[in-house]
């Protein structure tokens, strides 16, 4: 959530910044009308509260003198009814203003390139050289399906489209990748391993920005009066650990990692990536989340992105690093780097990690704060999140980049300890 002062004091300037950087149309007329009404009702509410307090004091004094207080009591009762109505009206207006605020995306950092979509993202670096094959390259489905290692048909029978059953050595490869990533981030990068719930409440989804705007992309469960959401990423529970908390400065930065299932309805994906495991309703990811002081967030962003890069480098997977333009960034981010891994079957780079600095946007929604030793007062944290990395897409990249002419797959050196020393699949 943006600073409410921006909405109240500079709505026109804010609207122009949102339009030019995010393509977001802020209804300033509605906003200004509601804000004017809020001020009017708030002033009247405060007047009534003051009158009630003064009359209540007068009643106490009159009673002490033994005077008749019936008239005063009737007057206060009248104030009470009007005050209750005024307070209720104020709550309604505040809820409307909050609803508007919750639907406004974050403002990009000054050093984010302007652009309308992914075609205007800016490549920052490349690592590794894509392998030149002397045989016809197969995609991950052609490599895995004939052996029954990737089974979309059975998954469709069980659950429908965009699910996959993994078996045998490919299931083991998938597990090995997740374990490798966790061990790397915990052992070498200093993140605390965390096991989080896969079902969260609406407050958690609002805190990180999935609600209210992206409800159609979430899977929900309802049991009786209890409604919960399946997490689209463990960013949600990890980041919400600091919700409604004041963190001591000595504990910062908080660096957390989790390996979890993720669930996405993919409501806006249409017919994209319907083949294989590129875009699934259920997938696994190793997530990185950091909560830190504002002055450290840019350095933590660079550090987090580097941690994700190391995963790909240790696996020997060529990739490129891209700085997203204003029109391609996520709702909550002020700045985002994507890492895109080389897929030989597509002869292109595909996203495998997205690392975002959200500034104080999520922290304001969550009331996540730290105690600044310089002032002694609670101040908003900065939060960051990144994929370290998507496990299924890493598996696809390993299968395709390490394939042989006979359809077998070499196991990267970094994964062999997790595969019982196995050097080749197939």
From Swiss-Prot:
ATP binds at residues 264-266, 351-354. It catalyses: tRNA(Ser) + L-serine + ATP = L-seryl-tRNA(Ser) + AMP + diphosphate + H(+); tRNA(Sec) + L-serine + ATP = L-seryl-tRNA(Sec) + AMP + diphosphate + H(+). One of its GO terms (cellular component) is cytoplasm. InterPro entries: aa-tRNA-synt_IIb, aa-tRNA-synth_II, aa-tRNA-synth_II/BPL/LPL, Ser-tRNA-ligase_type_1, Ser-tRNA-synth_1_N, SerRS_1_N_sf, SerRS_core, tRNA-bd_arm. Pathway: Aminoacyl-tRNA biosynthesis; selenocysteinyl-tRNA(Sec) biosynthesis; L-seryl-tRNA(Sec) from L-serine and tRNA(Sec): step 1/1. It holds the Pfam family tRNA-synt_2b. Its main location: cytoplasm. One of its GO terms (molecular function) is serine-tRNA ligase activity. Keywords: Aminoacyl-tRNA synthetase, ATP-binding, Cytoplasm, Ligase, Nucleotide-binding, Protein biosynthesis. One of its GO terms (biological process) is selenocysteine biosynthetic process. It is an enzyme of class 6 (ligase). It is found in: Cytoplasm. Its EC number is 6.1.1.11. L-serine binds at residues 233-235, 287, 387. It comes from the Bacteria. Belongs to the class-II aminoacyl-tRNA synthetase family. Type-1 seryl-tRNA synthetase subfamily. Homodimer. The tRNA molecule binds across the dimer. Consists of two distinct domains, a catalytic core and a N-terminal extension that is involved in tRNA binding. Catalyzes the attachment of serine to tRNA(Ser). Is also able to aminoacylate tRNA(Sec) with serine, to form the misacylated tRNA L-seryl-tRNA(Sec), which will be further converted into selenocysteinyl-tRNA(Sec). This is Serine--tRNA ligase. It comes from Xanthomonas campestris pv. campestris (strain ATCC 33913 / DSM 3586 / NCPPB 528 / LMG 568 / P 25).
């Amino acid at each position: 959530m943006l600073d409410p002062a921006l909405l109240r004091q500079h709505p026109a300037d804010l609207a122009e910044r949102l339009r030019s950087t995010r393509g977001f149309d802020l209804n300033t007329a509605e906003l200004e009308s509601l804000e004017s009404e809020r001020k009017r009702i708030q002033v009247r509410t405060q007047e009534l509260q003051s009158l009630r307090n003064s009359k209540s004091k007068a009643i106490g004094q009159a009673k002490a003198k033994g005077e008749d207080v019936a008239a005063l009591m009737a007057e206060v009762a009248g104030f009470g009814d009007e005050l209750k109505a005024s307070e209720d009206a104020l709550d309604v207006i505040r809820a409307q203003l909050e609803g508007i605020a919750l639907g406004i995306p974050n403002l990009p950092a000054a050093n984010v390139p302007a652009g309308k979509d992914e075609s205007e993202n800016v490549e920052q670096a490349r690592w590794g050289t894509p392998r030149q094959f002397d045989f016809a390259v197969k995609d991950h489905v052609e490599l895995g399906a004939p052996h029954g290692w990737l089974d979309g048909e059975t998954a469709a029978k069980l659950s429908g489209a965009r699910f996959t059953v993994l078996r045998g050595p490919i299931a083991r490869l998938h597990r090995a990748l997740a374990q490798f990533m966790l061990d790397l981030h915990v052992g070498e990068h200093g993140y605390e391993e965390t096991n989080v719930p896969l079902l969260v409440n609406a407050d958690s989804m609002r805190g990180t920005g999935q609600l209210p705007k992206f409800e159609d992309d979430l899977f929900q469960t309802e049991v009786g009066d209890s409604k919960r959401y399946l997490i689209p990423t463990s960013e949600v529970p990890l980041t919400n650990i600091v919700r409604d908390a004041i963190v001591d400065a000595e504990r910062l930065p908080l660096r957390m990692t989790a390996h979890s299932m993720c669930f996405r309805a993919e409501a806006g994906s249409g017919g994209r990536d319907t083949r294989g495991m590129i875009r699934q309703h259920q997938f696994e990811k190793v997530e990185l989340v950091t909560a830190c002081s504002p002055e450290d967030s840019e350095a933590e962003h660079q550090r987090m992105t580097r941690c994700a890069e190391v995963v790909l480098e240790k696996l020997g997977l060529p990739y490129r690093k891209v700085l997203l333009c204003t029109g391609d960034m996520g709702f909550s981010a002020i700045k985002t780097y994507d890492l895109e891994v080389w897929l030989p079957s597509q002869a292109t780079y595909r996203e495998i990690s997205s690392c975002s600095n959200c500034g104080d946007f999520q922290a304001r929604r969550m009331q996540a704060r730290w105690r600044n030793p310089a002032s002694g007062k609670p101040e908003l944290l900065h939060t960051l999140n990144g994929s370290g990395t998507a496990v299924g897409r890493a598996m696809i990249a390993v299968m395709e980049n390490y394939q042989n002419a006979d359809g077998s797959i070499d196991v990267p050196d970094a994964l062999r300890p997790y595969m019982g020393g196995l050097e080749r699949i197939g």
